[in-house]
């Protein structure tokens, strides 16, 4: 076991999570300036500081050559997800939104793993920054934080494949470009573009239909859809918007986000044969159609 490589990569994961937490911190600052009752900045400042500090400490273990094989990949994947869930729960605890550690850890793990189970009842009373972070965990987990690490870290070598394979399910968790870092980067670009497209459709489309969904709601709803987890900022979930347009947009994008993203890459690079002969996609469509029909008939 190459422990120095494991510690070094875990340090990078913690640093990345700390930087990602800056987004909900900015949301908290914005809504505080707008006069809304928001969570204290400290709810995010403390975990950000801890993640950046401890991450840098772990990075001191950097070996001369970062060697990652199957065993290291599995350890990094397992410990990485525990760490992000542990530190990701701190904003809930510090803000008092979910004061119980076990409940906060459950909520965060549910978010990062895109499970969508929740311990919350009165969701709408929570601060906007906490709601943003809650939905953002879905978006981060939708493609995997370790895949995100590979995508943004330069010089990710072929050994990174073992990390990506440990995290990404399915038979097509292989390369789509010669370099694994380019593969992860390409998939994340597709993921991000699709998320932005949904945000724009929800924001501007609801103005045409007369519902006028706020930008905040458009963003967090798109995060939840992208991760296919379903965290909402309303007690009645998506029904609270009273909009068939919003429901249909989410249905379509949930289906699109559930597709193996390698297929989108093949379509964009005009590798149509590889895309349309994929047995996984055909099975995915059949399962969806079958259960849609069965559930609809029983409602």
Label for each model-derived stretch:
Residues 1-299:
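Membrane-proximal intracellular helices of multi-pass ion channels
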